[in-house]
């Protein structure tokens, strides 16, 4: 520095230099600030996300702590007891049966004593206070109702060991009984709200002394089918005379009670339909129930569509039970149900199919004498102290000779109608029920009659019947030799039935369907029916196999002299060589 320089100038220069440096620094800071701002914003966002995650974690941990605390509290609770409510008092105390003793307890504030129902299950805390009301008990012992006592709140029941006890009716059962008594309601048998009746099975808690529920008797429900059959007399062919007989026996007494009373004529209590298998015995019984319901509806001025009747179809062999007295009990329950239905003025038909399997002649059993008690039970039901008003018994059997004579005497099964095998005229009537004009018929067959479908089907039926009933070589079936030495040739027509005719028509329809698939030509032909007859006869060739040919002959409708020798005479399609059997020396091979 020169000695001539001014000190003030030097100071000013230095200050200016400092200001320039500061300005430069500010310029650099201003240039860097946007990048720092973005960095700071990014850090803020990151911290915010982290903070949110931490908050969620804390909330989840808090919820887990609360759940764990509740679980600890729940595990630490003392056990609860259960009891059956016996009664409610005005002071909000209740009587409860619990732990084998009757106790008077109080209700917690959360339970309204007035809403509790007798017989209801309640939950008790450690202080024996009612804290919750539950449902009615659903498990227990089954007892049979003997009678409901006059107060309508108690009942006399019988347990398994025939022990009688008085039990309270839980509120649902008591309410049903009171309503039915007050309103005189005839509840339906299947309704859970129908009136209690003797013989009902009840769910009972013998310790608490309460009956909770009516349990359907499955063993009886399986044996009895309540229905209004949709079968008409027009559906039955070839049995006009038998239908008239059963209508006179069943329908007239129901429809003209005043005339029967005027002439002092007692209506029949029962009808026996007997004859070979597959000839329409069950169909007739069902048609009777349907026709009777419609006739009574018309007499009362009701719509025939609303006609009501009951057809109790008893599965005969299943009625038998290995336990002593069970079969008799089932019979009592069946007739009890029939009387209840009939009390409404509705006709009830009790139909015993295969009657010989249940009510065979007493003393004829080989390994069992069950018939010695079952037969008297039926007799007592038919003509016992309790009448069978509006109830008629119909039995069906193909071995009427095995039914106990006491059942068949007048006053029990009064009317006996034989359902015979169809003759040629009856067979035409039966065929007409299955070969109807709505069926597709082959155009060639219709063309033979100038396009007259009705005439074609009529002639088709006549040809088929002629083929079935011709006493020709190809229709021979058996040669039987009787004990007196007489011989007789039996043809397939001697074993025809309505069921066989239906099967022949069904076979022919199947052949017609196969013909459509093979040739494309639709329609039923006479040849289809002829082929079906041959197949049906050939299949029946080997069917009459039994260890007792005389029994088989009786079932098939051939009664009379005892058969001692049988020889087959089948010569149709696929027929094997004739076979013979001497029934005296060999009883287990063919017939």
UniProtKB/Swiss-Prot annotation:
PROSITE patterns: AAA. One of its GO terms (biological process) is proteasomal protein catabolic process. SMART domains: AAA. One of its GO terms (cellular component) is proteasome complex. The keyword Cytoplasm does not apply. ATP binds at residues 278-283. One of its GO terms (molecular function) is ATP hydrolysis activity. Residues 590-591 are annotated as: Docks into pockets in the proteasome alpha-ring. It comes from the Bacteria. Residues 8-77 form a coiled coil. Keywords: ATP-binding, Chaperone, Coiled coil, Nucleotide-binding, Proteasome. InterPro entries: AAA+_ATPase, AAA_ATPase_domain, ATPase_AAA_core, ATPase_AAA_CS, NA-bd_OB-fold, P-loop_NTPase, Prot_ATP_ID_OB_2nd, Prot_ATP_ID_OB_N. Pfam families: AAA, Prot_ATP_ID_OB_C, Prot_ATP_ID_OB_N. Belongs to the AAA ATPase family. Consists of three main regions, an N-terminal coiled-coil domain that binds to protein Pup and functions as a docking station, an interdomain involved in ARC hexamerization, and a C-terminal ATPase domain of the AAA type. HAMAP family: ARC_ATPase. ATPase which is responsible for recognizing, binding, unfolding and translocation of pupylated proteins into the bacterial 20S proteasome core particle. May be essential for opening the gate of the 20S proteasome via an interaction with its C-terminus, thereby allowing substrate entry and access to the site of proteolysis. Thus, the C-termini of the proteasomal ATPase may function like a 'key in a lock' to induce gate opening and therefore regulate proteolysis. This is Proteasome-associated ATPase. The gene is arc.
């Amino acid at each position: 520095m020169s000695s001539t320089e001014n000190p003030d100038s030097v100071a000013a220069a230095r200050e200016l230099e400092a200001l320039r440096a500061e300005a430069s620094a500010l310029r650099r800071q201003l240039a860097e600030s946007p990048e720092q701002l973005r960095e700071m914003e990014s850090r803020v966002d990151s911290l915010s996300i982290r903070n949110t995650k931490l908050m969620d974690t804390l909330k989840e941990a808090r919820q887990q702590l609360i759940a764990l605390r509740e679980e600890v509290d729940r595990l630490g609770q003392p056990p609860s007891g259960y009891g059956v409510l016996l009664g409610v008092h005005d002071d909000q105390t209740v009587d409860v049966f619990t732990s084998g003793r009757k106790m008077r307890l109080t209700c917690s504030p959360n339970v309204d004593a007035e809403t509790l129902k007798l017989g209801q299950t309640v939950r008790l805390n450690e202080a024996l206070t009612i804290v919750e009301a539950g449902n009615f008990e659903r498990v227990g012992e089954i007892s049979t109702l003997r009678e409901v006592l006059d107060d309508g709140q108690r009942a006399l029941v019988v347990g398994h060991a025939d022990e009688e006890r008085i039990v309270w009716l839980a509120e649902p059962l008591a309410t049903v009984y009171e309503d039915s008594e007050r309103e005189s309601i005839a509840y339906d048998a299947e309704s859970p709200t129908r009136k209690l009746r003797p013989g009902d099975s009840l769910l009972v808690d013998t310790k608490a002394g309460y009956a909770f529920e009516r349990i359907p008797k499955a063993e009886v429900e399986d044996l009895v089918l309540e229905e209004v059959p949709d079968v008409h007399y027009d559906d039955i062919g070839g049995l006009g005379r038998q239908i008239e007989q059963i209508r006179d026996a069943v329908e007239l007494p129901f429809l003209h009670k005043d005339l029967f009373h005027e002439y002092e004529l007692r209506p029949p209590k029962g009808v026996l339909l007997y004859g070979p298998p597959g000839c329409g015995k069950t169909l007739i019984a069902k048609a009777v129930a349907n026709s009777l319901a419609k006739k009574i509806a018309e007499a009362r001025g009701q719509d025939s569509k609303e006609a009501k009747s009951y057809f109790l179809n008893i599965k005969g062999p299943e009625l038998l039970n290995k336990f002593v007295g069970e079969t008799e009990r089932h019979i009592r329950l069946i007739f009890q149900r029939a009387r209840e239905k009939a009390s409404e003025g509705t006709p009830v038909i009790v139909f015993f199919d295969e009657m010989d399997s249940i009510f065979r002649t007493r003393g004829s059993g080989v390994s069992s004498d069950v018939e010695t008690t079952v037969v008297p039970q039926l007799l007592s039901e038919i003509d016992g102290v309790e009448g069978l008003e509006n109830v008629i018994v119909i039995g069906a059997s193909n071995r009427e000779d095995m039914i106990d004579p006491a059942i068949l005497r007048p006053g029990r099964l009064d009317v006996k109608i034989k359902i015979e095998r169809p003759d040629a005229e009856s067979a035409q009537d039966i065929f007409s029920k299955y070969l109807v004009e709505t069926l597709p018929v082959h155009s060639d067959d219709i063309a033979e009659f100038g396009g007259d479908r009705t005439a074609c089907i009529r002639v088709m039926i006549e040809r088929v019947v002629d083929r079935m009933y011709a006493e020709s070589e190809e229709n021979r079936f058996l040669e039987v030799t009787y004990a007196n030495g007489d011989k007789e040739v039996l043809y397939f027509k001697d074993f025809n039935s309505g069921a066989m005719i239906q099967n022949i028509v069904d076979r022919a329809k199947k052949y017609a369907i196969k013909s459509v698939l093979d040739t494309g030509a639709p329609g039923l032909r006479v040849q289809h029916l002829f082929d079906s007859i041959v197949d049906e006869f050939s299949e029946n060739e080997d069917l009459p196999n039994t260890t007792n040919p005389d029994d088989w002959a009786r079932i098939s409708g051939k009664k009379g002299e005892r058969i001692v020798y049988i020889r087959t005479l089948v010569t149709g399609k696929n027929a094997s060589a004739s076979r013979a059997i001497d029934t005296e020396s060999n009883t287990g091979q063919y017939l």
